[in-house]
């Protein structure tokens, strides 16, 4: 289980640039406080780095 990440959206998408909203959608997050489990790959890490201020990673 160490090669997976629990990603939670903790900040609203209102007023964010379209690029950030696209990254959130690419991670599979839809609403505030939703959580998804994704594999720990460089692609996912890159997406997380772009919107790290909006996420909680466990």
Curated annotation (Swiss-Prot):
CC annotations in GO: cytosolic large ribosomal subunit
Subunit description: Part of the 50S ribosomal subunit.
Biological source species: Pelobacter propionicus (strain DSM 2379 / NBRC 103807 / OttBd1)
InterPro entries to which the protein is assigned, alphabetical: Ribo_uL30_ferredoxin-like_sf, Ribosomal_uL30_bac-type, Ribosomal_uL30_ferredoxin-like
Coiled coil segments of this chain: none
Gene Ontology molecular function, alphabetical: structural constituent of ribosome
Keyword Ribosomal protein: yes
Similarity comment: Belongs to the universal ribosomal protein uL30 family.
Name of this protein: Large ribosomal subunit protein uL30
BP GO annotations: translation
Pfam families noted in UniProt: Ribosomal_L30
Keywords annotated in UniProt: Ribonucleoprotein, Ribosomal protein
